[in-house]
Amino acid sequence: MSLKPIHHLFIASACLVIVSFLSLMIGNTLVSLPQLIQALFHFDGQNDVHTLVTGSRASRTIIALLTGAALAVAGLFMQVLTRNAVASPGLFGVNAGAVFFIVTGVTLIRVHSFEALVVMAFVGAILVTILVVGLGMFKQARFTPQRVILAGASISMLFTAFTQGILIMNETNLQGLLFWLSGSISLRNIWDIPWMMVIILLFLIAGFFMAPHLNILMTSDEIATGLGQNVKRIKWVIVLMISVLAGSSVALAGSIVFVGLIIPNIAKLILPPRYQLLIPYTALLGSCLMISADIVARVIIRPLELPVGIITGILGALVLIYLMKKGIYRV
């Protein structure tokens, strides 16, 4: 007997709660369940374990939860926009733009504060998205996903080349940038930038209310127009959603690959193509993957730590190979 969609949502929610608790408990210092409960409900500022749980571990768990959900939903929206099951937010050049601004800030402007770098990465992601969409629509008023994808690929290669050139000329700063370039949520403090958390949450909620429009848009532009939808405006809203969600994620965690590609495909294999279900389910799966990958990154070479982007890259590559082997794609 197959499970109903609501059951899948419940299971994904339960998994998210479990991995979140594990994230608070696992690391170089193991925290027992009684200690965790004590830290959460009877906090003692003089207790090192309580400070660890509610400080760095809570912060990185929240960052992993938010970035995983944001990247996954941005990937789902990208696949709707392009009607391509292997599309991901990176096609807009978001990663390349954000990383370029981070590298420029550290090496040329000498910016080292986490808050300032997050702002620079976020602005870079948004500006590059605007540039890509502008080039994709150059000399034509109509939004064509194929042209935008080509523009995104070109701009990504251009900014990647700029980034590599700057790094080669400033090798002294390379070590400090490696973790950010590889994708990492260690040494991040969400409490220093609560506004970024608010932005991601607001756009995730707004994405859910876009679901009815996405259901219609997935038929065809002509049918959507015939049903009274303003297709051009919907596509521009989708572009905004992708750029803000993906840009926020890259700003917080660096360049994380594959989450926006594999999670929407997995969600569409499990649930029917109704975006009222797919959007929250995709967000839950993305959060579960990011938190799980972060846990693995902490313990696999303990006491050292791997960038979480390496773990998501390995997992994503394996899942993508499996999907390609099975020929399973559905938009």
Question: Predicted segment positions?
Answer:
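Alpha-helical transmembrane segments in inner-membrane proteins
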Residues: 1-331
